[in-house]
């Protein structure tokens, strides 16, 4: 029995008293953000600065998409402001942030859901799945998948009104911020307009 229990622990079948790991507080990488309502995928390079509550998102061009604009977003939560910069013209919009800072991590009061491997034999990564599910509320509004080693985000999914609304996949992550100036808005934002720009022409 002890041998069987040890095997299950190693393979991720059973995890006793799992505790949320501490995710990196600063990193850069790439994401795919999927809006389930519209069916739209947005690929982007991301710089994440947890201590200063800053996020920079640079949309990636993947092929020619007719009449599609690509933007850079600089979100400064401590200042409650977001800058939207059109990548070609550098036109800038300054928009108030109304949502609170939501870090990429596993909250301390999260519920452990599962542990498993992603990938196949010889090329696999162990991850843990956590949620905000509580005993009095059977359904969760957030599910996060993080690597066991180094606690990097793999996927986060949000649900509302019993349906999945958004999901984000993370990849190519490396710790630290190579150039902190990416969080500084360009000079065109000194005369920014106060309305969000349309993504289509």
Region roles according to the model:
Residues 1-54, 89-90, 116-121, 182-201:
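N-terminal leader/targeting segments and the immediate start of mature chains
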Residues 43-109, 157-172:
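An acidic-aromatic
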Residues 10-19, 97, 104-126, 136-142, ...:
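Non-transmembrane domains of secretory- and envelope-associated proteins
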């Amino acid at each position: 029995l002890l041998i069987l229990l040890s095997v299950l622990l190693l393979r991720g079948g059973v995890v006793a008293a799992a505790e949320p790991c501490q995710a990196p507080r600063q990193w850069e990488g790439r994401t795919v953000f999927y809006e389930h309502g519209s069916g739209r995928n947005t690929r982007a390079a991301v710089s994440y600065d947890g201590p200063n509550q800053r996020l920079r998102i640079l949309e990636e061009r993947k092929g020619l998409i007719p009449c599609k604009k690509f933007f850079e977003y600089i979100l400064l939560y401590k200042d409650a402001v977001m800058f939207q910069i059109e990548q070609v013209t550098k036109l800038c919009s300054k928009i108030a942030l109304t949502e609170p800072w939501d870090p990429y991590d596993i909250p301390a009061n999260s519920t452990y859901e599962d542990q498993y491997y992603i990938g196949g034999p010889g090329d696999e990564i162990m991850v843990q799945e956590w949620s905000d599910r509580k005993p009095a509320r059977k359904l969760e509004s957030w599910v996060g998948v993080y690597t066991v080693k180094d606690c990097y985000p793999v996927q986060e999914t949000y649900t509302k009104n019993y349906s999945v609304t958004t999901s984000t996949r993370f990849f190519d992550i490396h710790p630290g911020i190579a150039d902190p100036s990416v969080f500084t808005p360009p000079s065109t934002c000194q005369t920014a307009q106060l309305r969000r720009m349309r993504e289509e022409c």
